[in-house]
From Swiss-Prot:
Organism this protein belongs to: Pseudomonas sp. (strain EST1001)
Keyword GTP-binding carried by entry: no
InterPro entries named in the record: FAD-bd, FAD/NAD-bd_sf, RIFMO-like
SUPFAM superfamilies given in the database record: FAD/NAD(P)-binding domain
Family: Belongs to the PheA/TfdB FAD monooxygenase family.
Molecular function (Gene Ontology), one example: phenol 2-monooxygenase activity
One BP annotation, GO: phenol-containing compound catabolic process
Annotated protein name in UniProt: Phenol 2-monooxygenase
Keywords recorded for this protein, A-Z: Aromatic hydrocarbons catabolism, FAD, Flavoprotein, Monooxygenase, NADP, Oxidoreductase, Plasmid
Coiled coil: none
Entry superkingdom: Bacteria
Length: 607
């Protein structure tokens, strides 16, 4: 992955102490100010990915975090197809897969009384069931994987820093002011106690700000531990439906045991009553909780840590104020159900950073940044609603088992056993349980939610057309289409020597047009339009005898335009515009689209 050096900074007063050819390291000047194009606050998934995307585009940036290092607990882990496509585009897919639990081991989600106890039911998850696996493989060049945040963050941070990001640990954001030229951010070096100012053209808040509304916060607790459980539960997630004895802190009858590393590092998640004081644990109590959960009294357990966190049901309706944009948990807070948190955070940054790059390179006016809120705020609402919906969908499982009102362990076990009876009531409970478990596909096999995102903004031109109606459940299934606003469909292209995806040749650093052999005039026009607008615009002509060929005919079946039509793909691989067939003046058509909508208010256009 290559990067471009960018020296487009205010030079007076700079005090450069080291320049490695990618990024110059400054000390505060005589006015105690350090300058950069973009300041990123926070090094989590949103922050570290934003730094990586910007540095890949050649945009100078500083990333600060008040902490000494990256995430110290596993936290997020499911990395869905859309995020893996983005990491593939950033050139780090192989690095991620080298550390991740691969897709084929993500396996089943098992519901059980305890991990070594009786199984209640299971569902194949994350596209591992054969029919759904085909859906996943046909939709994308990348498959989901399971990588803890403790391993993913350092990969993104390393690549960001190698490409030019200045990373400042133990540096705390204090406040900011902004004007029509930039943002002045007051920060604190927590090691020296020195306060200084970072002057940036734009500020990204990716520090996972907590909600101020106490009523929206619920308490949950994690215990991270090591134990060899390969004999009992070789699966990535095990909801434990029970009342393990001697556990004092519980949120009624639902626990989760999550695999961190196969099969000897795990994370226990359970709830406590937020009307009471938060629980205080020591290692001995934590070990006993783990043993009760697993159902093995003499299990050898090493406690790695425990931490509190909160559930929320919140999303922002506007993500930007002037030159300050927010991303990640700062704009959407929700339960971990469905694994949408870190995925959405990285996707926020992906959407924002190509727009920042266009503006900072002089290829677009600042109005383009307004489309960040227009496009991503509805996604924030969608994923918060879906995550909370997935969490609430556990109640029908308890209702089917008849244990919702159980108050003691004996009563719980007695009611749980009724599902096995040879009786009409037993049959009713079994049928209700199966229906409730099947409904969990909306959490664990919701490919449409994960990659079917649609953008409707001034950076998308539909020419008055309506989005095609879905023929299947839009949350469970992904429907491929080149309709503007949707994600570019995946198809395998190539030649006799190599094979690559449509996503691979529509790089995230430029706009791309796709056309066929009889659409060569579009490709010729693209060269002239790129020169007039001063942008990087790539033309791909697909067909027999061309450098790029439709190997299996998949692109022909998915493109939805004639061979002489054209599809404009934005740097984030969403369709910006399409024309069904050739027009009388392709250069004017392409110029008007790019200058008027996808890149609004270009300061100076070369006619």
């Amino acid at each position: 992955m290559t990067t471009q050096r960018n020296d487009n900074l205010e030079q007076p007063g700079r005090s450069v102490i080291f320049d490695d050819g990618l990024s110059a390291t400054d000390t505060p000047n005589e006015t105690n100010v350090v300058e950069t194009e973009v300041l990123i606050v926070g090094s989590g998934p949103a922050g570290s990915s934003a730094a990586m995307f910007l540095s890949t585009q050649g945009i100078s940036n500083i990333m600060i975090t008040k902490y000494r290092w990256t995430a110290n607990t596993p936290r997020a882990h499911i990395t869905n197809q859309r995020t893996m496509e983005i990491l593939r585009d950033a050139g780090i897919e192989d690095q991620v897969l080298a550390e991740a639990v691969p897709h084929e081991l993500m396996g089943d989600t098992v519901y059980c009384e305890s991990m070594a106890g009786e199984e209640i039911g299971r569902r194949p998850t994350w596209g591992t069931r054969p029919d759904r696996r085909a859906d996943y493989e046909l939709a994308s060049p990348a498959m989901p994987c399971d990588i803890p945040q403790t391993l993913l963050e350092p990969i993104m941070l390393k690549n960001a820093t190698m490409r030019g990001t200045q990373t400042q640990f133990s540096t705390e954001y204090l406040s900011h002011t902004q004007d029509d030229k930039g943002v002045s951010v007051q920060v604190l070096n927590r090691l020296t106690g020195q306060e200084y100012t970072i002057r940036a053209k734009y500020l990204i808040g990716a520090d996972g700000a907590r909600s101020k509304v106490a009523a929206d916060i619920g308490g949950s607790m994690n215990i991270t531990f090591k134990a060899d459980l390969s004999h009992w539960r070789p699966s990535a997630l095990d909801p434990v439906l029970g009342l393990p004895p001697r556990i004092e802190y519980r949120w009624p009858r639902r626990w989760f045991d999550r695999m961190v590393r196969p099969w000897n590092e795990w994370l226990v998640v359970w709830g406590f009553d937020i009307n009471q004081e938060p629980p205080k644990l020591n290692d001995d109590e934590a070990i006993q909780i783990v043993r009760n959960l697993v159902g093995i009294e003499d299990l050898d357990v090493e406690i790695l840590g425990y931490s509190l966190w909160g559930n929320n049901d919140q999303y922002a309706t506007h993500l930007q104020k002037g030159r300050v944009c927010c991303a990640g948990d700062a704009i959407h807070k929700h339960p971990p159900s469905h694994g949408l948190g870190s995925n959405t955070s990285i996707q926020d940054s992906y959407n924002l950073c190509w727009k920042l790059a266009c503006v900072l390179k002089g290829q677009a006016g600042p109005e383009l940044l307004e489309t960040y809120s227009t496009e991503r705020a509805p996604i924030a609402k969608q994923i918060v609603t879906r995550a909370n919906g997935s969490s609430s969908e556990y109640k029908p499982i308890f209702d089917a088992l008849g244990v919702t009102d159980a108050t003691t362990n004996d009563e719980f076990v007695e009611k749980l056993a009724l599902r096995k009876e040879n009786s009409p009531e037993g049959a009713r409970r079994r049928a209700a349980l199966r229906a409730a478990l099947d409904n969990k596909d909306y959490e664990f096999n919701a490919q449409g939610t994960e990659i079917g995102q649609f953008y409707d903004s001034s950076a998308v031109i539909t020419d008055g057309q309506k989005r095609p109606a879905m023929t299947e459940d839009p949350m469970l299934h992904h429907q491929k289409s080149t309709f503007p606003g949707l994600r570019l469909p995946h198809a395998w292209l190539g030649d006799a020597k190599e094979k690559y995806s449509t996503h691979d040749i529509a790089e995230g650093t430029r706009f791309t047009i796709f056309t066929g052999i009889t659409g060569q005039a579009w490709a010729d026009a693209a060269v002239r339009v790129a020169e007039r607008l001063g942008i990087d615009l790539k033309a791909v002509v697909i067909g027999e005898g061309q450098p790029v060929q439709d190997l299996y005919g998949d692109w022909l079946r998915q493109r939805e335009v004639d061979e002489d039509g054209v599809i404009l793909v934005r740097p984030d691989k969403h369709i910006g515009w399409r024309a069904q067939s050739m027009v009388a003046d392709p250069e004017t058509a392409l110029f008007d689209v790019l200058s008027g909508c996808c890149i609004p208010s270009k300061p100076a256009l070369r006619i």
